């Protein structure tokens, strides 16, 4: 953060709506110039998530998973919450086993992303998984997740697939491409 910027003062935080999964807060702010505003946000949970980009035999492994927000099956990388006490790498390996049926001997952290930071505090850790071995764990998915193997040589063609459009997946694709370029693999 720029040292010349002063964060606004939080004057009040109030819960304005609650459901089984979400809590919406109203946040009264005063900026350093004296201007006051009321914003709304999802209550911070202080839990992060992980997105895993598995690579095997020069292919990416993606899954198709139902997204109720878009009411469609989305093509993307495996992801899930980091459980309390888990490291990013432990969560990545667990989610990979639950959703893809593989574990990884080689996990590489690429970047931590935020999504809609004006409304959410959540962070997504992007991890590449390599040197895979078959291993499954029971997950919390309501149905099996079909896998799609996509050749690394054509990875950017994913951008043309109408089911591959979620922003974190697109970001992960670009991050992985740059990481692979740095290794001389694409």
Curated annotation (Swiss-Prot):
Function: Active on adenosine(5')triphospho(5')adenosine (Ap3A), ADP-ribose, NADH, adenosine(5')diphospho(5')adenosine (Ap2A).
Transmembrane parts of this sequence: none
Keywords assigned: Hydrolase, Magnesium, Metal-binding
Known catalytic reactions: ADP-D-ribose + H2O = D-ribose 5-phosphate + AMP + 2 H(+)
Lineage start: Bacteria, Pseudomonadati, Pseudomonadota, Gammaproteobacteria, Enterobacterales
Binding site for substrate: 40, 118
Protein family per UniProt: Belongs to the Nudix hydrolase family.
GO molecular function: ADP-ribose diphosphatase activity; ADP-sugar diphosphatase activity; magnesium ion binding; protein homodimerization activity
Cited Gene3D superfamilies: Nucleoside Triphosphate Pyrophosphohydrolase
Domain Nudix hydrolase: 45-172
Record's protein name: ADP compounds hydrolase NudE
Domain of life of the source: Bacteria
Species of the source: Escherichia coli (strain K12)
Cofactor binding: number and manner: Mg(2+). Other divalent cations can also be used.
EC number: 3.6.1.-
